[in-house]
Amino acid sequence: MRLSWVLTVLSICLSALVTATGTEGKRKLQIGVKKRVDHCPIKSRKGDVLHMHYTGKLEDGTEFDSSLPQNQPFVFSLGTGQVIKGWDQGLLGMCEGEKRKLVIPSELGYGERGAPPKIPGGATLVFEVELLKIERRSEL
C-alpha cells in the first residue's frame, strides 16, 4: 500500500515536471509597438511587398545585421516564406511609418542550426523594424 502511494506521488510529480518544461521550452513571439502613426489607411497583410529598415541583435545586444548603414531598405513579400517566421508573423497589421520591436524565439528564427558565424544555434533574436512602404499585390 505504501509503495503504491509513493509511486502515485512520483508519477504526479514527473507529469508536472514534463508539463512545465514542455510549456517553458516554447517561447512566444513578442511584439512591441515603438512608434504608432496617426493616419493608417493601409495595414500590412500576407502577400504585400514591404520596404523595411531593420537592425537585428542577439539577446546580449550584439548586432548581427542592419539595413541602416547601406541606407537601402530591405524589400520582401510578407507571408510567403522569404523571411524568418518571426517576421512573417510579427509584421502583420503594420502601418507605414510604424516602428516595432520583435523578440523572436529560436523556433521562429534560425532554430537550433542558427546562421553561423553571426547567429548561434538556439538564439533568440531582437529586431527593431520600421515599415517604410507597403505595396499591395493589386497595385503591382
From Swiss-Prot:
Q: Which domain of life is it from?
A: Eukaryota
The source organism is Bos taurus
Q: Where in the cell is it found?
A: Endoplasmic reticulum membrane
Q: How is its activity regulated?
A: Inhibited by both FK506 and rapamycin.
Its recorded name reads Peptidyl-prolyl cis-trans isomerase FKBP2
Q: How does it assemble?
A: Interacts with ARFGEF1/BIG1 and the C-terminal of EPB41L2.
| Catalytic activity line of the entry | [protein]-peptidylproline (omega=180) = [protein]-peptidylproline (omega=0)
Q: Molecular function (GO) terms listed?
A: peptidyl-prolyl cis-trans isomerase activity
